[in-house]
Swiss-Prot record:
It is an enzyme of class 7 (translocase). Its main location: membrane. Its EC number is 7.1.1.-. GO terms for molecular function: NADH dehydrogenase (ubiquinone) activity; quinone binding. InterPro entries: NADH-Q_OxRdtase_suN/2, ND/Mrp_TM, Ndh2_N. This is NAD(P)H-quinone oxidoreductase subunit 2. GO terms for biological process: ATP synthesis coupled electron transport; photosynthesis, light reaction. NCBIfam families: NDH_I_N (TIGR01770), PRK02504.1 (NF002701).
Length: 506
């Protein structure tokens, strides 16, 4: 009988998608041992098979989720499936745009792919972790791999500096999480997130509030929310651009998945407190992220501050605490995947051809490279929330959900900062399109001939076309996509009780 109970509670099929990622890690490391030529040929194929199999298995799990696996330490519910799918897809696109960059930098491709897949594994496990211990293991798997990726260009001092800064701040965030977790365990006698929520209902104290602040600090670090954002611009500027592309979507998505799960389960009785703190973080992130982005001269730093502001928009949906709000947050993260990675695809392509990251060097680019100009323009307009782009509908759903939940201040700040973001996005577009031939930058004047048959460029082209198409045409499918996100929220058991209480309060 005990063996039967153990078998039932284990439910190992819940992590089949992660198992495919693990096999991909092993495969890429093995081909890396066979030599650089073998790795260059087979590492991408292994990654595609691994991530494709993971996405297919997630699709099969959608209709048959596993809500209690590994003795209650992992849930493969619909919300976790949605977030894990976003992360796996972001990794696939990030790898497509990274092969040429990695090849040109002279870095081992197999090793790079293995570390990216390791970060993906940690991020996906974090989305479904329901135990303080499994959360920490997943968090550290993601973090350590991210540190390695940030410093992957060993010969570039900026990359090493970025990795060191990321390591120091990330280690502090991990220590803060452990300290907060120790308080939660001491108060509840359990490491299970749901059990903690039940045990601390009648134990409001300074220690409980302190644990909330510590855990929320870790969440804010992962999603790069103000004032825990200081690492973001420096790490984004110094790290390899494909790594930045992955971190801006994959790591942020995992952070939001973790935030929703721990705040709505362990701190469900502190609903007002964490929503107040999240509101402050959202306002600061939207305001500072978009205002400081105005003054940036580096494209990567501008996108770094932009990502801080985008995190603030997603937080509007989480603070609303309603089914529509959480659904809008999921939808916007899915839209952000294509908008942001599309923009980074253009930045990578431009840097491969020119070696420059300065915004001023994009001046007059339309005359030499219409594809990058069109792609970057569409993605930036979508990030700004202009119709009929996918980003516009994502923001509309977030603002409507916030307004319906009486989050008027958040919505007003969101609207104002969206207008500010449109200004600096359009400034870049204007620089690329409007300039006369004689006003083009020196780099654009000597722009090299475009050759798409070079190793690594065809996958980048596929990723760029995909992101442009989804960003530009995704608005047409915004309603079906929102319904899909809505079903992910409504069919997740741990959210049903929370949503019922919220609906009764409205």
């Amino acid at each position: 009988m005990p063996n039967e109970i153990f078998t039932i509670n284990l439910n190992a099929q819940a992590i089949i998608p992660e198992a495919f990622i693990l096999l991909g890690i092993v495969g890429t490391l093995l081909v890396d041992l066979a030599g650089e030529k073998t790795a260059s040929r087979w590492a991408p194929v292994i990654c595609y098979i691994s991530l494709g199999s993971s996405l297919v298995s997630l699709a099969f799990q959608w209709s048959n989720p596993v809500n209690n696996a590994f003795l209650g330490s992992f849930n493969s519910d619909n919300l976790a499936i949605a977030f894990r799918s976003i992360i796996a897809l972001s990794t696939l696109i990030s790898l497509l745009i990274s092969w040429r960059y990695t090849e040109q930098s002279g870095s081992p491709i197999g090793e790079f792919a293995a570390i990216v897949l390791s970060a993906t594994l940690g991020a996906m496990l974090l989305c479904g972790s329901t135990d303080l211990v499994s959360v920490f293991i997943s968090l550290e798997t993601l973090s350590v791999a991210s540190y390695l990726l940030s410093g992957y260009l060993k010969r570039d001092p900026r990359s090493s500096e970025a990795a060191l800064k990321y390591l120091l701040v990330g280690s502090a965030a991990a220590a803060i999480y452990l300290y907060g977790s120790s308080f939660l365990y001491g108060l509840s006698g359990s490491t299970n997130l749901s059990t903690i929520g039940v045990e601390i209902i009648n134990k409001p104290s300074f220690i409980t509030s302190l644990s909330l602040v510590f855990v929320l600090s870790t969440v804010a670090f992962k999603i790069a929310a103000v004032p825990f954002h200081q690492w973001t611009p420096d790490v984004y500027e110094g790290s390899p651009t494909p790594v930045v592309a992955f971190l801006s979507v994959g790591s942020k998505t995992a952070g939001f998945a973790f935030a929703i799960r721990i705040l709505t389960t362990s701190f469900s009785s502190f609903d007002e407190q964490w929503k107040l703190l999240f509101t402050i973080l959202a306002i600061l992130s939207m305001a500072l992220g978009n205002i400081v982005a105005l003054a940036q001269t580096s494209m990567k730093r501008m996108l770094a501050y932009s990502s801080i502001g985008q995190a603030g928009f997603v937080m509007i949906g989480i603070v609303s605490g309603t089914q529509d709000g959480l659904s809008a947050a999921v939808l916007y993260l899915a839209a952000y995947l294509f908008m942001n990675l599309g923009a980074f695809s253009c930045v990578i392509l431009f840097s491969l051809r020119t070696g420059s990251d300065r915004i001023s060097d994009y001046s007059g680019l339309y005359q030499k490279d219409p594809l990058i100009t069109l792609g970057l323009s569409l993605c930036l307009l979508s990030l700004g929330g202009l119709p009929p782009m996918l980003g516009f509908f994502g923001k509309i759903y977030l603002f409507f959900a916030g307004w319906a939940n009486h989050q008027y201040l958040l919505v007003v700040v969101g609207l104002v900062t969206s207008v500010i973001s449109i200004y600096y996005y359009i400034s870049v577009i204007k620089m690329m399109v409007v300039k006369e031939p004689q006003e083009a930058s020196e780099i654009v004047k000597s722009y090299p001939e475009i050759k798409w048959n070079i190793i690594g460029l065809p996958p980048l082209r596929i990723a760029l076309y995909t992101c442009i198409a989804v960003t530009a045409l995704g608005g047409i499918l915004s309603n079906p996509l929102f319904k899909l996100a809505n079903s992910a929220v409504s069919e997740t058991p741990f959210l049903q009780d929370i949503l019922a209480v919220t609906n009764n309060m409205l």
